[in-house]
């Protein structure tokens, strides 16, 4: 059985979130939370919040044991891009892309054996 949680349109670039997400893939949830608490990246608290939501979903909706949960899948997709303009020299302007992320965390119970 799997439980998942998704955070959509988070205002952090997907490339930066993937650096954090790669640290917790395949880890037990307690270990994953400890790693996120000690990772000095802007995306860490956001990923931790999604992970805790997935854990709560597993416990409440599927009655899984929290102590046996493992981060089975975690991935980041690109959300809608906010386009802004920065004034440049000689009356020009250049485009700035403020990227957003969709963060998905899937937890499941660890197989015995």
Swiss-Prot record:
One of its GO terms (biological process) is translation. Keywords: Ribonucleoprotein, Ribosomal protein, RNA-binding, rRNA-binding. Disulfide bonds: none annotated. One of its GO terms (molecular function) is rRNA binding. CDD domains: Ribosomal_L22. The keyword Cell cycle does not apply. GO terms for cellular component: cytosolic large ribosomal subunit. Pfam families: Ribosomal_L22. Belongs to the universal ribosomal protein uL22 family. This protein binds specifically to 23S rRNA; its binding is stimulated by other ribosomal proteins, e.g. L4, L17, and L20. It is important during the early stages of 50S assembly. It makes multiple contacts with different domains of the 23S rRNA in the assembled 50S subunit and ribosome. The globular domain of the protein is located near the polypeptide exit tunnel on the outside of the subunit, while an extended beta-hairpin is found that lines the wall of the exit tunnel in the center of the 70S ribosome. Part of the 50S ribosomal subunit. This is Large ribosomal subunit protein uL22. It comes from Bacillus anthracis.
């Amino acid at each position: 059985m799997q439980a998942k949680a998704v955070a959509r349109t988070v205002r952090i670039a997907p490339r930066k979130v993937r650096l954090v997400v790669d640290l917790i893939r395949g880890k037990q949830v307690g270990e994953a939370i400890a790693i996120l608490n000690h990772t000095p990246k802007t995306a860490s608290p956001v990923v931790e919040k999604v992970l805790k939501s997935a854990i709560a979903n597993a416990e409440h909706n599927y009655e899984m044991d929290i102590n046996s949960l493992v981060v089975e899948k975690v991935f980041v997709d690109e959300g809608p891009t906010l386009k802004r303009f920065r004034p440049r020299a000689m009356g020009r302007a250049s485009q700035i892309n403020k990227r957003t992320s969709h963060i998905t965390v899937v937890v499941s119970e660890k197989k015995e054996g």
